[in-house]
């Protein structure tokens, strides 16, 4: 791996996609259209920009492809203002944008927070599909059922340290809870975060 904690944001983003915990504060610009949100980190690409001017037709075409592919439902299609969309469709738009960037590392923080069962199932399928393509998916979640069902390996943090590394097939929610509360630790001790 490469140490990136002191790298510029643009350099970090070259190799990772990020699905943020708070879709309103960090995932979308709520007063932008859906199509504008779909190219937030890509608008400088020659596909979407020429001589400092945005290629609106290319952006709209790209947004329409993602809307269709990820079943993002919005009243006015790509020109829908993000604020007017349901939480599930806002989250699907973020998932579409981030997964389409095709980066080797995906960091998903609370990706299903506040969503309905249908949207949760859809997002889970997308994350598993990315893992199956060989990408690294770092899932950060407080939903223990989600962690248990999606993870190949679980690292438990307590007080800024990794206190447990568990196989979801060999553990249960009760044991996970003991690690999370600090009542149980792996013998080797934890690595500081």
Features from the language model and the residues they span:
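Conserved P-loop NTPase catalytic core
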Residues: 1-85, 164-167, 172-174, 178-184
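Hydrophobic anchor residue at the start of the ABC signature
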Residues: 95
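A short, proline-enriched helix->beta-strand linker immediately N-terminal to the Walker B motif
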Residues: 98-106, 110
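Helical segment within the ABC ATPase nucleotide-binding domain
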Residues: 120-133
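H-loop/switch region of ABC-family ATPase nucleotide-binding domains
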Residues: 141-142
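A short, surface-exposed alpha-helical micro-motif characterized by mixed small hydrophobic
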Residues: 147-149
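Conserved short hydrophobic beta-strand within the ABC ATPase nucleotide-binding domain
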Residues: 153-156
């Amino acid at each position: 791996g490469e140490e990136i904690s002191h790298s510029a944001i643009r350099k970090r983003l070259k190799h990772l996609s990020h699905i943020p915990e708070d879709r309103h504060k960090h995932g979308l610009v709520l007063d932008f259209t859906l199509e504008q949100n779909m190219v937030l980190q890509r608008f400088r690409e020659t596909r979407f920009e020429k001589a400092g001017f945005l290629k609106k037709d290319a952006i709209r075409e790209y947004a329409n492809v993602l809307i269709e592919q990820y079943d993002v439902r919005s009243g006015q299609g790509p020109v829908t203002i993000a604020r007017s969309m349901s939480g599930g469709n806002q989250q699907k738009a973020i998932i579409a944008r981030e997964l389409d960037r095709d980066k080797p590392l995906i960091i998903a923080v609370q990706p299903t927070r506040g969503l309905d069962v249908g949207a949760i199932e859809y997002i889970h399928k997308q994350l598993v599909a990315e893992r199956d393509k060989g990408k690294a998916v770092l899932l950060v979640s407080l939903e223990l059922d989600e962690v248990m069902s999606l993870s190949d390996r679980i690292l438990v943090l307590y007080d800024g340290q990794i206190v447990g590394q568990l196989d979801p097939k060999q553990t249960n929610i009760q044991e996970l809870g003991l690690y999370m509360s600090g009542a149980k630790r792996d013998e080797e001790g934890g690595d500081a975060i």
